[in-house]
Amino acid sequence: MLPQDPVILLSVLNTKLRDKYSSLMELCDDLDEDEASLLVLMDRAGYVYDREKNQFKPSNS
């Protein structure tokens, strides 16, 4: 289960994406998480997924 706090979630996701998963889809499949819901949650917190860099970044950058 992933943390609900957006700042902690950001850290966990980016760490997992860097260390273990080659894509958000792979992470979501392995952790049984809904990718679309996760993207919406992170967007509401001000972050977007950068597929090229395989990490979440602030939406204003």
Report each predicted region and the residues it spans.
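Short alpha-helical "recognition helix" segments of helix-turn-helix
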Residues: L27-C28
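Generic serine detector
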Residues: S11, S22-S23, S37, S59-S61
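Short, charge-rich amphipathic interface segments used for partner binding and complex assembly
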Residues: D32-N60
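N-terminal acidic leader/helix
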Residues: M1-L24
